[in-house]
Amino acid sequence: MHTTDTETFEEQFAIEQRLVDSVVASFDSTTDPRLKELMQSLTRHLHAFIREVRLSEDEWSNAIAFLTAVGNITDDRRQEFILLSDVLGVSMQTIAVSNPAYEDATESTVFGPFFVEDAPEVTLGGDIAGGATGQPCWIEGTVTDTAGNPVPEARIEVWQNDEDGFYDVQYSDGRVSGRAHLFSDAHGRYRFWGMTPVPYPIPSDGPVGKMLAATNRSPMRVAHLHFMVTADGLRTLVTHIFVAGDPQLERGDSVFGVKDSLIKDFVEQPPGTPTPDGRHIGDRNWARCEFDIVLAPEQI
């Protein structure tokens, strides 16, 4: 009896579907309901991708080698897996589903791969540069909840790249610069000296950078400054502020992290302009930026 192409396709489809069903069923005894949901859904979607693109064995071997390389380059100073998540938009999608907009709360964005625990503390009005080079920038604002109440003693972690586009952890000398933490005062106010952010490329010497090059994608990030803000009873905020007027805003951000509400004016101040705290800047420009932070309730 002659077998038609349709019959052959249906037989192949049935073989593939039986495998999917078998793998999904293998998780039926999982006692944690959320873990069961995650593993079964992941299995269905992963197999659907393989079937849709007709993934070859060589392609899958290359994918495994790529993920192995991502793991091998990752250490306590470089998080290549976070970078991979960022450039695929997974980080921003997770943020979108996990941190829905709430009233006037400040919006979240990506964490990024360059956060380091135990950054040094600076006092209010202190300088986070720590010897890093860049245009001095005064940043100030108030931390409140969504009812407008000031939040005293909020812990504010800040970190940024230098004017050459590098974070301290990208240098091999163990320096700590361009990062610190501080606490808001009794009225929720905070202030510090940093550097005017500049755009920079994400690392291109690792597998993620090579992936972007292979797909003709730009590695550039829009100029930004990182914040992570924590306070009792309020939702932890991970966010950036972006520089209004940065040409990279029009070209796009390699990790899809820009939100309009986070674009802020960094107002250039000519040489000789008095600084808010009387600091002597010398014969150079500096900038200032105001960024008020609104924290959502921990439970929404």
Swiss-Prot record:
Keyword terms of this UniProt record: Aromatic hydrocarbons catabolism, Dioxygenase, Iron, Metal-binding, Oxidoreductase
Main enzyme class: oxidoreductase
Record text on cofactor binding: Binds 1 Fe(3+) ion per subunit.
Cofactor: Fe(3+)
Catalytic activity, reaction form: benzene-1,2,4-triol + O2 = maleylacetate + 2 H(+)
Cell cycle found in the keyword field: no
GO biological process: catabolic process; catechol-containing compound metabolic process
Induction: By 4-NP.
InterPro entries attached to this UniProt entry: Catechol_dOase_N, Intradiol_dOase_C, Intradiol_dOase_core, Intradiol_RC_Dioxygenase
This protein's pathway: Aromatic compound metabolism; Xenobiotic degradation
GO MF annotations, alphabetized: 4-hydroxycatechol 1,2-dioxygenase activity; catechol 1,2-dioxygenase activity; ferric iron binding
UniProt EC number: 1.13.11.37
Binding annotation for Fe cation: Y167, Y200, H224, H226
Biological role: Involved in the degradation of para-nitrophenol (4-NP). Catalyzes the conversion of hydroxyquinol to malelylacetate.
Protein name: Hydroxyquinol 1,2-dioxygenase
Gene: npcC
